[in-house]
Structures are given as C-alpha cells and as structure tokens.
Curated annotation (Swiss-Prot):
This is Sarcoplasmic/endoplasmic reticulum calcium ATPase 1. Mg(2+) binds at residues 351, 353, 703. It comes from Mus musculus. The modification Phosphoserine is found at residues 581, 643. Keywords: ATP-binding, Calcium, Calcium transport, Disulfide bond, Endoplasmic reticulum, Ion transport, Magnesium, Membrane, Metal-binding, Nucleotide-binding, Phosphoprotein, Sarcoplasmic reticulum, Translocase, Transmembrane, Transmembrane helix, Transport. Its main location: endoplasmic reticulum.
Length: 994
C-alpha cells in the first residue's frame, strides 16, 4: 500500500478489507501471500568463485604474461640437451606470479560482497498477529506476515514489516529508528494521518519501519508493505543496483597497461621482422623453422622484460603498509585500493551527528529569574563548559566561574533536573569514558547536575565510577520519587510526583516537578520563582522569558531549550487517576516557572581545525544531516563551514527544497552547497551522483543502514565505528573513533601514499624500459643474447621489488596539505617524465649491452673478437673463414650475461636512490632520509651475489662468478646514471617548474 502514512486508519483497514479486532481470514492470507510474496529480503546473487577467478585474468598485461608463459612452456617442451630443466623454470615462475595476483584479487572482491548479507541481521525472526482463525494473538514467523495483517508490537520487539499504527495501547510509543534515519534520539509515535504524501521517514510519525526497535510502549497496527517494498528493502535494492567503480589508480594502471601492451606488441613484431633475414643462419642448423622459433623466444623475452611483474605485489605491499599507518590513526581501511583514492578526495560529505559533533547532548546555557519589579524582569544567565557526558566543567556568569549553590534558583533547577529524569551516567571502565544510560536529553541534565554540584559534595576523592552520579544521588536522598507522569504529545512535557524523604527534616510538602517544551510549560505557569519566593507571572515577564528562549533557539547557537517548573501544592496522590493520560494536563497546572536550560549536540573540539585544513587543501566539506535547517546552519557556522555572517541562501538546502528544484538546478546546487538538512538517505545517493558528474572524488560518511547505498556509491564510503554492520560492510573505511578529524588525517596519508607510489611505479617502469632497450639493441645489432627471460624475471620481481617497496616509506612532502587535490585524470607519467624515463631507460639498455660487448671485445679473459665477428656471430661455423681459429661456443658463454645482469642490477640500485624525490637533488635529500631504502639496496645486492656465487643457482640463471676487475668495470659503467638523473632533475627544477 503506497503512502499509508497519509491515509486515515479506516482507509487503511478498508483497503485491505480487514477488521482491527479479528484480522485477516486464512483465505485472505493465502491470496496476499501469492500477490505480495514472503516477507523477507532475497539473498544476494553473488559471483561464483570461478567467475571471480576468471575476472582476475581480464587485465591485458596479465593476459600477455599468460601468453608468454604458454609459449615458453611449449618451447621448453621442444628444448633438447641439458637445458630442459632450466627451460621450465621460466613458465613456472610466471604462472606462480599470476596465481598469487589472482588470489589477492579474489580475496578483496569477496570482502566487498558481504555488505548486502549484513542487512539480514535486521530481519526479525517472529511477529505477533491477530488472525480470524484464532481468538487471541498468535506468534508466527516474520516471513509469513503479509500486507493487511494486524500486528501487535511491544517494548523490546523488532518491528517485522512496515506498519501503519492503528492504536497505541500505552501512554506513549517510542521507537528507536537510528538504523534507518541515523538520528540517535528515539521517536514518539502517534496514530493521526500525516497529510504530506512526500513526508520524509523522520516525519512519518504514524509508521513503524521494519527492522527498527520499540523502545517503550505497546501498539497495534496494520502491515502496509513487506519484504522488498519496505524501507529497508528499498535500501537493499539500491545497494544491489550500485556498481562499484574502479579507483583512479586502478583506471590509471589499466590505461597504462593498454598502452604498454600496444608498445610491447609493436616491438615484438618489429624484432621479428628485422630478423627475418637471419632465420636461415647456420647457427639454427639451416632450418628456417628453428630460426623463426629462436626469434620467437626473443619476442617472449621482450614481453617479459617490458611488463613490471613486481608492480602488483609492490603496490599491494605499499597499500597494506599504508593501511597499518592509518589504523594507528583510528582509520581502519577495508579495501586496499581506496587508500590511494583518499589522496584525491575533493569533497567530504559528513554526517553531523556524532562525526562533526560529539553525539553527547550537553547543556551549555541556562537562566533563572533574578528579580521582578512590576513589569520589569531581569534574568541571571549562566554558561556551562564541557562538551561531553563527563561530569567535568564549570558554571560561568559573565565568563567568571561561580558556585551554583549560592543561587536558590539554581538549587531548585538542579533538583528538577535530577528528579524529573529516568536516565543516569555510567563510567565505562574498558573504554575509559562516561556514557549515557537512557535518553540523550535527560543524560545532559544528569551531567549538568554533576557539574553544578549545588550542595558542594566532596567529589575529588571519588573514583570515576562513584563520581558519575555523586551529586544526583545527594538530591535523590532528599526527595523520594513516588511516580512519573509520562511524556505525551499533546502536552509536550513530563513530570514526577515527589515526597520529602523521612530523613530530611525540611518543612516541605509533596511537590510535582515538570520539564518540557518551553511554550507548553510556560502557558501552564501562573508564577515565577525569584530566589525562594514566588511572584505572579505577568504578560511582560512572560514576553521577556519567551524572547530569550527564541533568541537561544535561533542564531549561532540554535539550542534545544527545556523549561523547568514546579507545582508547589499538587493534588493528593489518592485523587489522581494515573492510567488516563488525558488527565495529566490538569495535574500539571498552576505551575511555578523555575528556569530554562539550553542544550546542543556540541561540535567536537578538533573539528574546526580540521575544516580549516580541508580548506587549505582545496577540499570542500558538505554537512548532511537529518536535523532541521536552523540547527544545521548554526553548527556549520560554529565549526567554520560557513563564516559568522555569510549569506547561506544558495548554500544550504533542506531535502524538500532540493527535491523541488529542476534537475539542472539540483546539479548546480550540489556544486555550491555546503549544507543539506532534513535529508533522506536517497538524497545522499543523489548528491554523490551529481558530484561525480563534476568529476569530484567524494568521501561520504554514514552510520545507519540507510546510509549504505550512498556509502557504496561514493568513491570513499566511510562508516562509523559505532555504526551498523551494514554500513561498515558497504564502506571502504571505518572510523574507529567516529571523528571527522580522522578523515582529514587519512586524506593526508592517502596523498603521501600516492606520491610514493608514483615514485616506485616510475622506478619500476624505467627499469623495464632499460630491459626492453637492451633486448631490442641486441636483436637489432645482431649481438648474442645479453639477458634471458629467467634473469629478467629475477630482476623485475626480486632485485627491483625490494627497493620499490622501500620507496613506499619515503617521508611525505611538507606542503602536502597545502595543494589542491590532484585531478583523478592527471596521468601517472607526463610528457617531461616520459622523456626522462626514455633517457634513463636508454642509458640502462645501452649500458647492459655495452657491458656484454665489453667482455667479448676487451676483457682480459675474453675471446677478443672483432666487432664484425660479434655482430655476425650467427654465421659462425667451422668452415667459415671469417671465424678462423675461433670456437663458436664462445658466443654462448655465461660471462657476458653475468656482466650485463650485474650492470643492470647496479644501475637499478642507483636509480632507487634517484627516486627518493621527483625533483630534489640527492644533495638536498640524502639517501639516509629513508633508512629502509638503504637496507633494501643492501639486501638486493646480497641476493644478486647469491645467484652469482652459491651453487646450483649460477647454473639455473646461466651465470658465472665475476672477478675484481670485472666488478670495477661494472661500477664504471653503472655510476654515471646518477649524474644523468641529477642533470635532468636540475633542468626540471630550474626551467620547467616556472
């Protein structure tokens, strides 16, 4: 049934053809079950494990590697002689890399899929219904409830479907809807129609929503919708429909992979074509086919050389280390790639309650009447410090601390706050904080009494557990609470009937203490309290009181005000009828006004500074709240989202105002606005969509089930540590301390991580460029192989992987939070950088080939061949006069390969030092700023020595131990790369950065 909240109870009953007393007949139940289906949320159709595994191989680079592995496997199969074993090493290693990558990928995907399952925990197991086949109420499984069923709910029950309330069987019905609306205060329900068909969930005061909890009272209602049609069901559908986008880094790496694969394909084809003439060379035994296969192997080597196999592992490691650093700052990251996305966040949409504020109501102002002279009335106004439930703070008058006990009016005000109250404070020893027990508003009054300490109780010697209610218990010993007149909507107040305790010999009789909404309570006051006397309440005095309340309720503070009053001579207990709440109004008449307290959910202390940080970093903060607009704007001014006198017409909207705008203007509003009030969860998703249309990277916070679709849609969903499991599973990050400042710290960390990733991605790629140049040069010049695939894999994975990982520990730049967020479209490698890589890569390639050639041409223990013989080695046979007196086997000697590999590794270690900073000289940023990097370079070199000097490794890698003169040559060839990069950095600093 649509818009049940706007229909009268009679209309709802006749729509389903049911009577409130008897319920549906078995026949109707059967028909409704067929029409509407069972009352449950369908299970999520997840991807099977096999589908997830296949998905991991959709990446182009992965496919090229897979192809290379298959080809080298086939080639290894046809290999003859002693090389058979070593030939299988390479395809085996490539496959291992691919499998490891796939496992990590599948594990991450699996985590993301659990969000929808978590919604299940809000489904109630059972429900209580009236049906025509039984006289009394019967308990049935919640999934069997159908629209039209008459359902009974009582305190502690979980609501089994979306229900329109027909009648309330207690004084009040309070419902905790925080999982749906995110607002922590429980809501008082009624049975009248809500005429507005477009009302937001917070305003549907005559509806009970599936999955919410009954906090107090008992009621009977008619089921309006079940299953997927309920509010929580709609949330599930939104979540199921939300596809996760790739993070900016994933998109970058995908683009990069595509470009790389095109380049690789081109180079492979080029190498093949250049050498078609050599296919028949005698070295291949004159067989064209074997010649083709030989160059095929070189093409495979090229593919292996060009792909940075170590990159996925290094990125994962760097992100994982980043998540550990963030966890120390209370930000728990659930999906690794989002660590980097945080770095380009340009908009943070934050909930107000609990994130920007403490979610601990606290009284910050109060007043009592000072004196009344005819129509002139003066007030004593006080402010109270402390913004949490901790009983620590002082009472100030004109900014100077005062003793509250000196003012008779404050003693009575404290008495009302302590007695007209069902809540208390509790010190949680495990968390080390004071927490509320009961309603937030009432706990604020309990805390106020503790701060006022009107009877000067000795509290310094008490433990924190005893301190929690010390001053309240003193007051509760003086007066005994007999009974409570519950809050009701018509009078907007509640009261307690108290009698003096036997022990106190004060000459006071019974009293009634009242607290409630100011207009309601003050209308029933005939007197005001001045000191210990009471004075008649005249029109001008009432106007004065109401004007202060109005001033407090608007403007910068927007406090929630409560009036406190006493009935000095209440009726006798015996004369009062306590089971008829309609009579409560008469008992709360003839009151004496005592004072007013103003409270708010105060902003967290650190938030103002964090918002300033965001402003410096070019990040816009948008506050989104279910609260009303006045309160929202006031908090925005307090924390610096708006300045004190800023005009907010185009920058703050309610959900309704936003909906009423045409679509184009809604989109425009999202570009300007910094505050949305009275919003529904669906608005959050809409806002994210509009922001994404401007290419903004949005971080969205949320804690309720209602926030899950928006959390899933935003690039960075941020759930609260105290939030629901659904919100946490739909988000990328969880704030352990629910604090907005933690988000800003995480953004800073994200920026630092991205900068470091840029450095090591560039480092790894320049290494690959060098390897490609090396293989291309040997093939183009017709030289013997300088590097074989298994050596390339070793370099890409191990020797380069360690320094690359260590580059993830580079310290962040000092001005990292003074720059605007980087555009997600900014390429990883810009034009100048591309030139730099090409220059460095070109040097690396030339140096490795040069080192191998040096051994052939000039080394003391080398064959001293001529350059012509070296470039035409393919034609070497015993019968060829050009190669007279030369053993052709020499062209397959391991020494030149060892020289080439050692030069490659040494240059890479120098390059790692170059990568400490993008443009800073090594003189300005010496190597020891990153001690991890020095350690990893030592480790990499040790591993290189391992494969040179420890059997059987040299055989597998086809290497030979080097002597001292050869190592000297390696260093001479390698070290100039540092000078080359310093020169390029110098040009960048002085001529390119304007």
């Amino acid at each position: 049934m649509e818009a049940a909240h706007s229909k009268s109870t009679e209309e709802c009953l006749s729509y389903f053809g049911v009577s409130e007393t008897t319920g549906l007949t078995p026949d109707q139940v059967k028909r409704h079950l067929e029409k509407y289906g069972p009352n449950e949320l369908p299970a999520e159709e997840g991807k099977s494990l096999w589908e997830l595994v296949v998905e991991q191989f959709e990446d182009l680079l992965v496919r090229i590697l897979l192809l290379a592995a298959c080809i080298s496997f086939v080639l290894a199969w046809f290999e003859e002689g002693e090389e058979t074993v070593t030939a299988f090493v390479e395809p085996f290693v490539i496959l291992l890399i691919l499998i490891a990558n796939a496992i990590v990928g599948v594990w991450q995907e699996r985590n993301a899929e659990n969000a929808i399952e978590a919604l299940k925990e809000y489904e109630p197991e059972m429900g209580k219904v009236y049906r025509a086949d039984r006289k009394s109420v019967q308990r049935i499984k919640a999934r069997d409830i159908v629209p039209g069923d008459i359902v009974e709910v009582a305190v502690g029950d979980k609501v089994p479907a979306d229900i329109r309330i027909l009648s309330i069987k207690s004084t009040t019905l309070r419902v905790d809807q925080s999982i749906l609306t995110g607002e922590s205060v429980s809501v008082i329900k009624h049975t009248d129609p809500v005429p507005d068909p477009r009302a937001v969930n917070q305003d549907k005061k005559n509806m009970l929503f599936s999955g919410t909890n009954i906090a107090a009272g008992k009621a009977v209602g008619i089921v309006a919708t079940t299953g997927v049609s309920t509010e929580i069901g709609k949330i599930r559908d939104q979540m199921a429909a939300t596809e996760q986008d790739k993070t900016p880094l994933q998109q970058k790496l995908d683009e990069f992979g595509e470009q790389l694969s095109k380049v690789i394909s081109l180079i492979c084809v080029a190498v093949w074509l250049i050498n078609i003439g050599h296919f028949n060379d005698p070295v291949h035994g004159g067989s064209w086919f074997r010649g083709a296969i030989y160059y095929f192997k070189i093409a495979v080597a090229l593919a292996v050389a060009a792909i940075p196999e170590g990159l996925p592992a290094v990125i994962t490691t760097c992100l994982a280390l980043g998540t550990r650093r963030m966890a120390k700052k209370n930000a728990i990251v659930r999906s690794l790639p989002s660590v980097e996305t945080l770095g380009c966040t340009s908009v943070i949409c934050s909930d107000k309650t609990g994130t920007l504020t403490t979610n601990q109501m606290s009284v910050c102002k109060m007043f009592i009447i000072d004196k009344v002279d005819g129509d002139v009335c003066s007030l004593n106004e006080f402010s109270i410090t402390g913004s949490t439930y901790a009983p620590e703070g002082e009472v100030l008058k004109n900014d100077k601390p005062v003793r509250a006990g000196q003012y008779d009016g404050l003693v009575e005000l404290a008495t009302i706050c302590a007695l007209c109250n069902d809540s208390s404070l509790d010190f949680n020893e495990t968390k080390g904080v004071y927490e509320k027990v009961g309603e937030a508003t009432e706990t604020a009054l309990t805390t106020l009494v503790e701060k006022m300490n009107v009877f000067n109780t000795e509290v310094r010697s008490l433990s924190k557990v005893e301190r929690a209610n010390a001053c309240n218990s003193v007051i509760r010993q003086l007066m005994k609470k007999e009974f409570t007149l519950e809050f009701s909507r018509d009078r907007k107040s509640m009261s307690v009937y108290c009698s003096p305790a036997k022990s106190s010999r004060a000459a006071v009789g019974n009293k009634m203490f009242v607290k409630g909404a100011p207009e309601g309570v003050i209308d029933r006051c005939n007197y005001v309290r001045v000191g210990t006397t009471r004075v008649p309440l005249t029109g001008p005095v009432k106007e004065k009181i109401m004007s202060v309340i109005k001033e407090w309720g608007t403007g910068r503070d927007t406090l929630r005000c409560l009036a406190l009053a006493t009935r000095d001579t209440p009726p006798k207990r015996e004369e009062m009828v306590l089971d008829d709440s309609a009579k409560f109004m008469e008992y709360e008449m003839d009151l004496t006004f005592v004072g007013v307290v103003g409270m708010l959910d105060p902003p967290r202390k650190e938030v103002t500074g964090s918002i300033q940080l965001c402003r410096d970093a070019g990040i816009r903060v948008i506050m989104i709240t279910g609260d009303n607009k006045g309160t929202a704007i006031a908090i925005c001014r307090r924390i610096g989202i708006f300045s004190e006198n800023e005009e907010v017409t185009d920058r703050a909207y309610t959900g309704r105002e936003f909906d009423d705008l045409p679509l184009a203007e809604q989109r425009e509003a999202c570009r300007r606005a910094c505050c949305f009030a009275r919003v529904e969860p669906s608005h959050k998703s809409k806002i994210v969509e509009y922001l994404q249309s401007y290419d903004e990277i949005t971080a969205m916070t949320g804690d309720g089930v209602n926030d899950a679709p928006a959390l899933k849609k935003a690039e960075i969903g941020i759930a609260m540590g105290s939030g629901t499991a659904v919100a946490k599973t739909a988000s990328e990050m969880v704030l352990a301390d629910d604090n907005f400042s933690t988000i800003v710290a995480a953004v800073e960390e994200g920026r630092a991580i991205y900068n470091n990733m840029k450095q090591f991605i560039r480092y790894l790629i320049s290494s690959n460029v060098g390897e490609v140049v090396c293989i291309f040069l040997t093939a183009a010049l017709g030289l013997p192989e300088a590097l074989i695939p298994v050596q390339l894999l070793w370099v890409n994975l191990v020797t380069d992987g360690l320094p690359a990982t260590a580059l993830g520990f580079n310290p962040p730049d000092l001005d990292i939070m003074d720059r605007p967020p980087r555009s997600p479209k900014e390429p990883l490698i810009s034009g100048w950088l591309f030139f730099r890589y090409m220059a460095i890569g070109g040097y690396v390639g030339a140096a490795t080939v040069g080192a191998a050639a040096w051994w052939f041409l000039y080394a003391e223990d080398g064959p001293h061949v001529s350059y012509h013989q070296l470039t035409h080695f393919m034609q070497c046979t015993e019968h060829n006069p050009e190669f007279d007196g030369l053993d052709c086997e020499v062209f397959e000697a391991p020494e030149p390969m060892t020289m080439a590999l050692s030069v490659l590794v040494t240059i890479e270690m120098c390059n790692a030092l170059n990568s400490l900073s993008e443009n800073q000289s090594l003189l300005r940023m010496p190597p020891w700023v990153n001690i991890w990097l020095l350690g990893s370079i030592c480790l990499s070199m040790s591993l290189h020595f391992l494969i040179l000097y420890v059997d059987p490794l040299p055989m597998i890698f086809k290497l030979r131990a080097l002597d001292f003169t050869q190592w000297l040559m390696v260093l001479k060839i390698s070290l100039p790369v540092i000078g080359l990069d310093e020169l390029l950095k110098f040009i960048a600093r002085n001529y390119l950065e304007g």
